[in-house]
Amino acid sequence: MGSRDFISSLPDEVLGKKILSLLPTKLVVSTSVLSKRWRNLFHFVDSFDLEDSTPIRNADSFSDFMKDTVALLSNCPIKRLTLNSHYEKSSVNRWIRSALKRGCLELNLQSQYDHYLDIGIFFRNNTLVKLTLSSYRTFLRGNVPPEGRVFFPALKTLSLGAVVAKPALYNWLISGCPVLEELFILDVGSGDDQPTWTRSVVSASIKRLTIVFHFPHNTYPYEDDVEIKTPNLEFLDYSALRSDGSDVDYLDSLAEARLDLRLWELTNTFDFGEVTNLVSAIRNVKTLHLSSSSLEAFYYRCYTMPVFDKLIHLSIESDKENGWQALPRLLLKSPNLQTLAIKGLLHKVTYRCGNACACTSKPKKRYLYKRYEDDSPTSEVEGRCCLSTCRVKVLEISGYGGSLREVKQMEHFLRKLKYLETVKIGVEEDNDSEHLRTELMTLDIASSKCNIQFI
């Protein structure tokens, strides 16, 4: 019995929209040689993905093919256009215009090459829902429209890589989207690279904001205040070296924040930048994730620690280069904390970790000074144990290796956290979890309800 060709038996619309639309366009083009029917299926494709992973013999021939195809399909709807390669500027602009005229919902420009775009291409577009500009550099040309002009009336998701534009045009790219819900900004450079982000995000509609801003070789990009005016923000992921100042409104709706506030390597005294305003603005969060360097930034450059009344879940990362100096004050300022998650127990040994740590070193008198400027007494950190008063019920440890220091730290947690109900431990792959479990079960545990789980 001969084998049945299930693919060819499918309806044309299913083949075009459900199968071919998921493939790189160059691969779709190659199917046109199979038969006349397969060539006609191109009319049903509503997603175009132009990239280099599927090479063709002649790039010029492909561009000519696309030119002819775009002309033929001028009346067909299109959902998504992705450009991830190097094509002539005129071809790129023509394909974008054609896609937008055909009701394009998603446009992605993402490649290792420069793209040059005239902002006028996007005028009068009422359909685009998702826009990604993440090429090596995207140069936007044009002028800001008259005040009050809406840019993308339907755009909900905007991703900006190295977008080079006049500050007013860059900011209008964000503020001109009245229903924008998710914004992603990536601006990373090295050497003498200049930043493209204007250090400003102003939007009343944004709910999710991710910013990665990293220029480690020069403090110049960080001398201006970072401005964030997003009253309806629910999620913030912010990764950057500390700026000299910040202008962040109180984020009343913020439920989750992920902070990676990096320390400057150019100085040894941590004397540049501050995070006080930013930390105060996020005091309403329920879930807070902090990198290891964020803990040090909280200690050195956050002068007034707010009370995190709504904080339920706190997770921190550890490494051997950074200490837990801010952890005691942070725990004492989180009266309703229920879950404490720690990725890696090994950290830099320093007496400033206080009673949150089992490996404190003996302080030198010349270093005994008050770091914070709030009205809390020094005894709040140096006297009252931040763990004994902490009402954490769940302790989650990942990357546990079972070293002597880690065992001591686990013993310290188990003896001090009196309200623990569950301890979840993720063990490194090379370790014997059963042996580590037996070892931990011999330790004193303050809470009679505590259940230790290895995951």
Curated annotation (Swiss-Prot):
Keywords noted in UniProt: Leucine-rich repeat, Repeat
UniProt cross-references to InterPro entries, sorted A to Z: F-box-like_dom_sf, F-box_AtFBL13-like, F-box_dom, FBD, FBL60-like, LRR_FXL15/At3g58940/PEG3-like
Gene3D superfamilies named in the record: 1.20.1280.50
Domain F-box: 4-51
Database matches in Pfam families: F-box, LRR_At5g56370
Keyword Magnesium belongs to the record: no
Transmembrane segments: none
Sequence ranges of the LRR repeats: 114-138, 152-176, 282-305, 308-324, 325-348
Keyword set includes Protease: no
Name of this chain's protein: F-box/LRR-repeat protein At5g35995
